[in-house]
Amino acid sequence: MYNNTLLFLTLAFCMAASSCFDANQVSSRPQESAAIVKTMQSSFYQLQANSLEGKPVSLDQFKGKKIIVLNVASKCGYTPQYADWERFFQSHKDQAVVLGFPSNNFMGQEPGSAEEIAEFCQKNYGVSFPMFEKVDVKGEGISPVYKWLTDPAQNGWNKQEPSWNFCKYLINEKGELTHFFASKVTPESPEFKEAFSK
């Protein structure tokens, strides 16, 4: 009984806290920023990240597809979004890919090892989209992928860091960052559907 109450209170707190952080649910690249893209210091496709199995993955293999980058966690109120994004991935494989980056940056909600994360995702949600090693998505130890996503000098316009677990970054078929979405946004949210259709 005590454990259930504690779990409920933790989830309630996390949802309340994340709703405070998610005041700006969507950020999109301003029209005039299109010219800035040409002077970006680096391309998303130049980046590399290690898979959940520890193998190097060059992100240029996703050229020509839209990319949705998620910072994920196993013990968050938004964790059920794994199912939403797996369904999205399965139905849009020809035109898009979802990349999951486990992170323990928010209230320690991803404490597991790579093996534990892989088992959790497969057992509970059947996750088949690419998953990567646990990384920092903010702060001094920020991973190169999230440094690119949050540094205007590299991506051309955006400085918005993840405000909680399950924030999303949308990258177009040319490797340009076009949108940031807060945790609450799912594949069925009107704002995501509109951005993805462009």
Specify the residue positions occupied by each region the protein language model found.
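Bacterial signal peptide processing site
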Residues: F21-D22
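N-terminal "domain-start" segment that seeds a small globular fold
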Residues: V26-D60, S143-P144
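Thiol-based oxidoreductase modules, predominantly thioredoxin-like and allied folds used
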Residues: Q95-S113, S128-G139
